[in-house]
Amino acid sequence: MPEIVDTCSLASPASVCRTKHLHLRCSVDFTRRTLTGTAALTVQSQEDNLRSLVLDTKDLTIEKVVINGQEVKYALGERQSYKGSPMEISLPIALSKNQEIVIEISFETSPKSSALQWLTPEQTSGKEHPYLFSQCQAIHCRAILPCQDTPSVKLTYTAEVSVPKELVALMSAIRDGETPDPEDPSRKIYKFIQKVPIPCYLIALVVGALESRQIGPRTLVWSEKEQVEKSAYEFSETESMLKIAEDLGGPYVWGQYDLLVLPPSFPYGGMENPCLTFVTPTLLAGDKSLSNVIAHEISHSWTGNLVTNKTWDHFWLNEGHTVYLERHICGRLFGEKFRHFNALGGWGELQNSVKTFGETHPFTKLVVDLTDIDPDVAYSSVPYEKGFALLFYLEQLLGGPEIFLGFLKAYVEKFSYKSITTDDWKDFLYSYFKDKVDVLNQVDWNAWLYSPGLPPIKPNYDMTLTNACIALSQRWITAKEDDLNSFNATDLKDLSSHQLNEFLAQTLQRAPLPLGHIKRMQEVYNFNAINNSEIRFRWLRLCIQSKWEDAIPLALKMATEQGRMKFTRPLFKDLAAFDKSHDQAVRTYQEHKASMHPVTAMLVGKDLKVD
């Protein structure tokens, strides 16, 4: 079989050598906005007579490379846009197969590192101390330290991080104590250990004025003090979710499961950094209604972090299985009808992505080809929701949830600590269901896996909780001007916040609505007063797409006060598409760009066709 190549990495592939361990020693400089230190990589040759190897780097300054106490020659290659620069290291001795060597690289990051966001004190809740956080997925670890920046290689790590002593450092690892910095009494060194091998996109660091509160036997929630109480309340279901996840996936091997609530510019809903999930503060709805994101990140402890996509072309393996587990966790907590409600909502999100890209766009394929494509640019709900839809369809085809969950647990056990491709997954599916090969052969695999657009088959969904959302949405969509008086606040009295959100999602699919309808909707439902981020996002999109000028400042405010890309990018796009707000949207972006997360700033710039 031909070797799978990771087209997103410039480093030597796993067939040549593998990084087994990283020992990171670094110092965080908030004045210069740099991380300076050494990365000691234990590398194992996978072939005989290995004389040199290549690592990924991006915007790094390399001071020197030392092997066995001796400086060795290295060469930084030409920058290849988003992939960074390959770093070739000459080895002092030729390695034989399985021989290990420790390569110590002294490096410094750039203030513009795409992996890091440096916040001024004014950008924090406490307004007193600066803040730093990393986001390495998919291919930004190379902008922190030289590495084989591919999910096909897994390594353990230890770290020692020096920070100003009034701040706290956390990593995607078990905390291993803190000591005064012997070289600077105004600083402290925090130590970490990660004994489970992980792909380097799961290396994570945060430094800030952080406090914690225990919310479960293996869970602390961390944030600035202003958010700690609210976060502890919002995420109180964490331990019960973990227990259900263990029942579905097998033992939780990571020891601790902490949560970190980041400042508003964090670009994602959550990031499954091991031992320390990162989440957006936009989940703080006050009623635990957005806790499915926690169920999702918990589920990654099995699908993604234990069983990992071998390359980003197979990202759906991480996300489709994780959404499938997430929805089972929520189903166990809130009922099977709720699982189906969320599943159908996900199909709607998939429809939106396919509509946005166009039904023949290659990014709407489940398995993508990222040759010369930045994974950040290809990112969408497709791997999540098309991936989930395939698994949900297979569940129904193969005999129901219990049967398919049996497969999922066996899949996790089979591929734990490994990195795999779609073919590995499919081969195991066929071997697990060897008595149902005829059923599996009914699946149009080429359409599901390799063709663009919506899947060839839509699974069956229980409509119980969705029907009320559709009914109310249809009333608004079909209403004539004379009918608007028939709407009143009691329309919503029996709807949960999840259903209210789905009502808006359904209505948004039919936007624009007549402006009079939107104004009446605000009059009777007072949506402007709702702070639930998912509801507010869809409401403001509906307003802007229906050309309500009064909503422009509200939409601009939401697009800039937080930076979760799920919200910020569509809001900016809608504002730019409305003639009355186009110039203001571009101007607002340009004013905020310097203080935005680097990836968010880049992608919004592309969306708005500026820069």
Swiss-Prot record:
Subcellular compartments: Cytoplasm
InterPro entries assigned to the protein according to its UniProt record, in alphabetical order: Aminopeptidase_N-like_N, Aminopeptidase_N-like_N_sf, ARM-type_fold, LTA4H, LTA4H_cat, M1_LTA-4_hydro/amino_C_sf, M1_LTA4H, Peptidase_M1
Pathway membership, UniProt: Lipid metabolism; leukotriene B4 biosynthesis
Residues the record marks as site: Pro-Gly-Pro binding: 272, 563
Listed Pfam families: Leuk-A4-hydro_C, Peptidase_M1, Peptidase_M1_N
Record: active site: 297, 384
Annotated site, Essential for epoxide hydrolase activity, but not for aminopeptidase activity, chain positions: 376
Stated consequence of mutating residue 376 to E: Strongly reduced aminopeptidase activity. Abolishes epoxide hydrolase activity
Catalysed reaction equations from the record: leukotriene A4 + H2O = leukotriene B4; (5S,6S)-epoxy-(18R)-hydroxy-(7E,9E,11Z,14Z,16E)-eicosapentaenoate + H2O = resolvin E1; (5S,6S)-epoxy-(18S)-hydroxy-(7E,9E,11Z,14Z,16E)-eicosapentaenoate + H2O = 18S-resolvin E1; Release of the N-terminal residue from a tripeptide
Post-translational modification: Phosphorylation at Ser-416 inhibits leukotriene-A4 hydrolase activity.
Impact upon substituting residue 135 to A/L: Srongly increased epoxide hydrolase activity
Effect of residue 270 to A: No loss of activity
GO molecular function: aminopeptidase activity; epoxide hydrolase activity; leukotriene-A4 hydrolase activity; metalloaminopeptidase activity; peptidase activity; RNA binding; tripeptide aminopeptidase activity; zinc ion binding
Secretion signal, residue range per the UniProt entry: none
Regulation of protein activity: Inhibited by bestatin. The epoxide hydrolase activity is restrained by suicide inactivation that involves binding of LTA4 to Tyr-379. 4-(4-benzylphenyl)thiazol-2-amine (ARM1) selectively inhibits the epoxide hydrolase activity.
Organism superkingdom: Eukaryota
Tissues expressed in: Isoform 1 and isoform 2 are expressed in monocytes, lymphocytes, neutrophils, reticulocytes, platelets and fibroblasts.
EC annotation from Swiss-Prot or TrEMBL: 3.3.2.6, 3.4.11.4
Subunit structure: Monomer.
Described purpose of this protein according to its UniProt entry: Bifunctional zinc metalloenzyme that comprises both epoxide hydrolase (EH) and aminopeptidase activities. Acts as an epoxide hydrolase to catalyze the conversion of LTA4 to the pro-inflammatory mediator leukotriene B4 (LTB4). Also has aminopeptidase activity, with high affinity for N-terminal arginines of various synthetic tripeptides.
The protein, known as: Leukotriene A-4 hydrolase
Organism the protein comes from: Homo sapiens (Human)
Encoding gene (name): LTA4H
